Amino acid sequence: VCSSDLLVRKGDEPIAFDHDCREGICGMCSLFIDGEAHGPGRGITTCQLHMRKFKDGDTIHVEPWRAQAFPVIKDLVVDRGSFDRIQAAGGFVSVNTSGNLVDGNALPISKPDSDTAFDAATCIGCGACVASCPNSSAMLFVSAKVSQLSLLPQGRPEAKMRALNMVEQMDKEGFGSCSAIGACEVEC
């Protein structure tokens, strides 16, 4: 923060970075810090990373996500619109518009299905899985979103097509293939 103030006073622009919630729930702050997605520590995002994780005098290397599908916009800001396009490719639910609608809240969902869908919905789309994968694969993100959308009764008729469309869009966006290394799961 002090460095940004000094740059502004000199008439220079501070380094651009993305942020939104500052609570670790939006994923906008995603950075590669000292060779790790979100920096040292597990289960946190960059905005939750405290300077006490580093020693006095440490040189800290901060980089944007490194993936073809996340082009750098400026400095540390990347375009993660590819995730939005993947979700849009499969994130739809057919609706009966004949007038004989069943209230969506009236459809019972079992507790195990609800819990599993909720677990899949915890993906905030930060991209740490892609950034940590040597192949820049988005398969963990896609599988989380496919699971989230397919476990609920709404949208079951198109579940298979949704999954195929999302994987196809992932390929179109330039993400790499999964080779089951598991780095994505470690960073998520």
Where do the protein language model's features map onto the residues?
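A basic, amphipathic helix-loop patch mediating RNA/tRNA/ribosome contacts
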Residues: S4-D34
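Ferredoxin-type iron-sulfur electron-transfer modules in oxidoreductases and energy-metabolism complexes
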Residues: S4-E13, I60-E187
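Short, surface-exposed helix-loop/turn micro-motifs enriched in polar/charged residues
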Residues: F17-C21, G39, F141
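A generic, well-ordered mixed alpha/beta core segment in the N-terminal half of proteins
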Residues: C26-S82
